[in-house]
Amino acid sequence: MTVTIAVNGQRRSVQPGSTVTDLVAEITGRAIATDGHAVDGSRVGVAVARNAAVVSRSLWWSTAVTAGDEIEIVTAVQGG
């Protein structure tokens, strides 16, 4: 059984008990540590909001994704 959420406006199914860390890892294709940084030490370069509230990187691992959640994953870009 899966849970349906929206990620950047697109419906997506995830496993029950999934966290923001799990979702970011799946979307970026990178292993993410519990501190929200890439395991390989490189920058992840994304910010996450769950139901219009920003989720601090340090809380990704403990923030569960539940049915009906609307998740926005924004990629950071340089510029001015």
Question: What are the language-model segments listed below?
Answer:
Residues 1-79:
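Ubiquitin-like/PB1-type beta-grasp interaction modules and other compact soluble beta-rich domains
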